[in-house]
Structures are given as C-alpha cells and as structure tokens.
UniProtKB/Swiss-Prot annotation:
Protein's membrane topology: Multi-pass membrane protein
Coiled-coil residue windows: none
Protein name from the UniProt record: Major myo-inositol transporter IolT
Other comment: When iolT is inactivated, inositol uptake is almost abolished even though iolF is active.
GO molecular function, one term: D-glucose transmembrane transporter activity
Length: 473
C-alpha cells in the first residue's frame, strides 16, 4: 500500500512539474493585455496600432509553427527532452521581451516565445496522456488546461497589482513580463528529474527502460500488462515507414485528422480569445470605465479557473461528446444574449453589468467543457506513431484560427459594433454544434491502443452506424 502511495505521489509530481508548461502558456498569452498600454508609451516602445498588432500576433504565429515542429521534435527526441528544450526557449525569450530596447526586438522575442508556447501546447498533453492510467487519463491530461487558465489569471492579477502600485513607473511592463522567467526555471529543473514517456521508449526499442518507468507509476502486474499492450500496438506500426505528412492521407488516419482539425477549429471559433485578449476592451465598449473594466477582466480569469476545476471533475464522469455539446450550446447562447442586450440596452447603465455577467457565463461553459475536452481529445485520438505529427498539424490549425479570430475581432468591433460581431460568433457556434453532433466519436473509457483499433475498424467497415455514445472510431 505504501509502495502504491509512492507511485501515485510520483505520478502527481510528474503532472505538476510538466504542466508548468501550461502555466507559461497561459501567462504569456494573458500578460500582454495589461502590459500593452505601458509598453506603447512614447518613451518606451512607442507603439502605434500596426506595431501593437504585430507585438500581439507575433506570438500566435510563433505558436502555430511551434505546434508543428514541436510535435516532430517530440517524436524524435522524446517528450521529456522536448519539454526541457522548450523551458530554455521560454526563459531566453522572456528575458528578450523584458529587456527589449525597441519594437523589432520585442516582436522577434514574442515570436520565439510563441514557438515555445506552441511546442508546449502539443508536447505537454501528449506526455501526460502517455503517463496517465486509462481510467484517470481525462482528469490528468486536463490538469494542463487548469494550469493554462491559472497562468492567465496570474497574468491578470499581477498586471492589476503592478499597474496599481507601480503605474507611475514607465518600465512597469517589463516587471509584468519578467515574472514568467520563474516558472520557466522551475519547469527546466523539475523536468530533469522526470522520466521519459514509456510509450515513446517502446517506440525506440527501449522496452526495459519503459518497464522501469511504468513500475514507478503503476503496480508491478499492471506495469507488465500495460507494456505488453503498448508493444502489441507498436508491433503493428513497426512495419510501417517513419511518419510523414503522406501518412495523414491514409483513409482511417484522414478521418482522425479531420476530427482533430474540427475539434481545434471549434474550440477557437467560439470566440473565447476575443474575450481573453480583449476582455477589458469589450467591457469598456459596453460602458465600464477603465478601472472597472480591469477588475472585470480579473473576474473572467477567476471564473476560468473555477470552471476548469468543474470540467476536470466532469471528465471522469461524463462522456466527451455530451460535454462538448453542452459547452457549445452554452457559449453560443451567451454570445446570442450579449448581441441582443447590446442592441436593446444600448446606452443603459445596466449594459456593462449584463455583458460582464454574460462573459462570465460564456467562460464557465468554455473553460468548464469545451477547452478541457479539446486538449484531451487531441492528445488521445492519434495513434502512437503519428501522435506527435498529428497533434502538431491540428494544433497548428488551432493557433492559426486563434490568430485569425484575435486579429479580426478589434477590426470587426470598430466596423460593425459589439452586437453584430457577436452575432457572427453565434452563427459559427451553431455550425460547431452540428459538426460535433455529426462527426465526433466518444473516447471515454478506452485506452489509446483501443482507440486506434476502433479507428482502423471504422475504415474497414466503411460507415459509421451510430454517432452516439457507442463509437467505432
């Protein structure tokens, strides 16, 4: 019993340390919300609308590329080594952003930082999925999502604290940015002591090392059985050539890619990052003063963390499909109400409070259902040999849609107003509900190897009989 307790304790340590990649992901995507006003001052980087957009979006471009190359590097070097490498990039690029003397250095540093963010968005969920036992994989993988939203909340809180206490210091934005160097150091030194993924070790023929790792996080009998299951799955793939983009055109793999791309797009076209990146501007647009809007932005961060706790709890009890459907219906309804009330209550002192309550409601559904399911399913639907490449391609798509939404939102807001902008997202939300209902398989309760078998079986059967809870792929 004591040995089993040590195994669980070590597994929890693995989860805590590796998900600091998610914390960095969240902090670095959220911190600019409060840093930009100070950064843009004439005696600092002197940003205009164009360069401000470049500083913001350069991270997203880098993240898109980091997702693709991070997946391939993860397959080649291993999940653990890749996370160590990403921690170094996080640290160096954070220092580059902090001490940037001009906008050019800032854009380059943000781009490099984005590569680390994108790489972490692929590698950390894959590492967690491959270390977790099947019955708790959902809860453990979505710990990363919890760390992402916690990182965003920390960014909002530190921005508010530093902005309030050091607002008269023109370099306050540099203090906001440099904070991210601390979790980068923790991630690096923590991962040095963590083991490599047993599934990756088997893929490299290191079966004894894989068994040694499994015995550290499973009881001996289960470790041996799980190793056999991994070996059996790998033997089927061992006869195939090394994974390339051409492999993604194989019919049964193509279906997985289609589902993965759909999940990635669905998560972003809800408009979540229009709220996470421009939440303060949305609240100001609805009638709040700047200070009240900043406080409201912290409320958005708090509800994101609380909702993610609920989402992690639900994943162990509810299927992926019903969670995603419920989340999409909730977010689409919240956006519809924002659009309607922005028209009906235009100019009313009640409008900003209504909009704030609805953005909080939106984030409760987004972070409590949609986002946890997204990252979990992307980490579990691809077969071992294609997991790094497959996640890289789908998360590249996720980041590019993220960029498109984040880039166009302020343009739409200025051109057609708050209500019409959100009506567009309502239309996209309806399309997302239809996609999930028609195409999304259920993966709860299945091992990664069983999922692969089901996708292969779907290809041989030629048609899916039922898109409900029982799934053939």
């Amino acid at each position: 019993m004591n040995k089993q307790g040590n195994q669980m304790s070590f597994l929890r340590t693995i989860i805590l340390v590796s998900t600091f990649g998610g914390l960095l992901f969240g902090y670095d995507t959220g911190v600019l919300n409060g840093a930009l006003p100070y950064m843009g001052e004439p005696d600092q980087l002197n940003l205009n609308a164009f360069t401000e957009g470049l500083v913001t979006s350069s991270l997203l471009f880098g993240a898109a590329l980091g997702a693709v190359f991070g997946g391939r590097m993860s397959d080649f070097n291993g999940r653990r080594k890749n996370i160590l490498f990403l921690a170094v990039i996080f640290f160096i690029s954070t220092i580059g952003c902090t001490f940037a003397p001009n906008v050019t250095v800032m854009i380059i540093s943000r781009f490099v930082l984005g590569i680390a963010v994108g790489g972490a968005s692929v590698t950390v969920p894959a590492y967690l999925a491959e270390m977790s036992p099947v019955e708790s994989r959902g809860r453990m993988v979505t710990q990363n999502e919890l760390m992402i939203v916690s990182g965003q909340l920390l960014a909002f809180v530190f921005n508010a604290i530093l902005g309030t206490t050091m607002g008269d210091n023109s370099h306050v934005w540099r203090f906001m940015l440099v904070i991210a160097s601390l979790p980068a150091l923790f991630l690096f030194f923590g991962m040095i002591r963590m083991p490599e993924s047993p599934r990756w070790l088997v893929s490299k023929g290191r079966k004894e090392d894989a068994l040694r790792v499994l015995k550290k996080i499973r009881d001996e009998k289960r470790a041996a059985a799980e190793l056999q299951e991994i070996e059996f799955a790998f033997k089927k793939e061992d006869q195939l050539e090394k994974a390339t983009f051409k492999d993604l055109s194989v019919p049964w793999v193509r279906r997985i890619v289609f589902i993965g791309l759909g999940i990635a797009i669905v998560q972003q076209i809800t408009g979540v990052n229009s709220i996470m990146y421009y939440g303060t501007e949305i609240l100001r647009n609805s009638g709040f003063q700047t200070e009240a809007a900043l406080i409201g932005n912290i409320a958005n961060g708090v509800i994101s963390v609380l909702a993610t706790f609920v989402g992690i709890w639900l994943l162990g009890r509810v299927g992926r499909r019903p969670m995603l459907m419920t989340g999409l219906i909730g977010t689409t309804t919240a956006l519809l109400l924002i659009g309607i009330f922005s028209l009906v209550l235009e100019g009313s002192p009640a409008l900003p409070y209504v909009v704030l309550s609805l953005t909080v409601t939106f984030l409760a559904f987004q972070q409590g259902a949609i986002s946890p399911v997204t990252w979990l399913m992307l980490s579990e639907i691809f077969p071992l040999r294609l997991r790094g490449l497959g996640m890289g391609v789908t998360v590249f798509c996720l980041w590019m849609v993220n960029f498109a939404v984040s880039f166009t939102f302020p343009i739409l807001l200025a051109a057609i107003g708050l209500s019409t902008t959100f009506f567009i997202f309502v239309g996209l939300g309806i399309c997302s509900v239809l996609f999930v209902k028609r195409f999304l398989p259920e993966t709860k309760g299945l091992s990664l190897e069983q999922l692969e078998e089901n996708f292969r079986a779907y290809d041989h059967s030629g048609a899916k009989k039922d898109s409900g809870a029982e799934v053939i792929g």
